[in-house]
């Protein structure tokens, strides 16, 4: 009988220790810094069609047939990805119609412009393939796409290598009431594009944004740079809701001109 009681006591002690350890571990987790995962996402509402892929998250607009925004974090390691598969532009099966298709861009005179660029997604064949989905694509002027926009993309990768990672949100801007359209599904042609960047430095968070007209733009990134606050005021959206507001009110170009 005494042996039986001893066994029961040992079992109870083990259970109590397990529970105590469990609460201790939970406390340790809660004491850790908040993960940066998801910090690249802008504020969004419950009625937006949010699409999550390996390399980016997008909010797809079924009226414009363009993403309202595309967000991703690019790390230093990801900039050296070696994946180089060739993939077709495709509609995204994860979103319902109406949505853009290849036929909309055929002979339109507009580039299929990546928001999250192919070069940022070469760390994974899946991420690379998904960068060609139309939830990541907008009609872009060819010169702007290959000149001004490309230079901003290259600057972004340099910042990821320099600072370890960069948070990125970009997308189209529609200024005019009467939008240009292309294709049988009437994909709206953006008037401008924005791109907002944030990096963590020893002096705190640093941000910058760019606004580029969707025409024959060839300028340097500096010529399009504005405070993130300026873009947020136009869009009516907080692009980096987890960051301090003061980090978005101005930019120090010396941080980005490297």
Predicted regions, residues:
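Domain-level detector for secreted/extracellular nuclease and nuclease-toxin modules, and
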Residues: 3-10, 16-258
């Amino acid at each position: 009988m005494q042996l039986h009681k001893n066994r029961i006591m040992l079992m109870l002690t083990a259970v109590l220790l397990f529970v105590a350890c469990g609460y201790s571990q939970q406390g340790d987790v809660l004491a850790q810094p908040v993960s940066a995962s998801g910090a690249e996402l802008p504020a969004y509402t419950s009625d937006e069609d949010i699409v999550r892929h390996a390399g980016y998250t997008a909010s797809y607009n079924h009226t414009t047939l363009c993403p309202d925004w595309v967000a991703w974090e690019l790390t230093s390691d990801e900039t050296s990805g070696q994946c180089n598969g060739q993939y077709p532009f495709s509609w995204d099966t994860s979103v319902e119609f109406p949505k853009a298709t290849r036929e909309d861009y055929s002979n339109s005179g507009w580039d299929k412009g990546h928001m999250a660029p192919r070069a940022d997604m070469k760390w994974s064949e899946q991420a690379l393939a998904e960068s060609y989905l139309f939830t990541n694509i907008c009609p872009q002027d060819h010169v702007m796409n290959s000149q001004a926009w490309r230079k901003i993309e290259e600057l972004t990768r340099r910042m990821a290598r320099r600072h370890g990672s960069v948070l990125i949100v970009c997308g189209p801007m529609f200024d005019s009431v009467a939008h240009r359209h292309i294709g049988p599904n009437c994909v709206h042609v953006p008037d401008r594009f924005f791109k907002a960047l944030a990096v963590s430095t020893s002096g705190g968070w640093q941000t910058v944004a760019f606004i580029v007209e969707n025409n024959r733009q060839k300028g340097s990134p500096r010529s399009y740079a504005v405070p993130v606050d300026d873009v947020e005021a136009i869009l009516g959206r907080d692009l980096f809701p987890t960051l301090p507001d003061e980090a978005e009110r101005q930019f120090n170009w010396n941080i980005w001109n490297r």
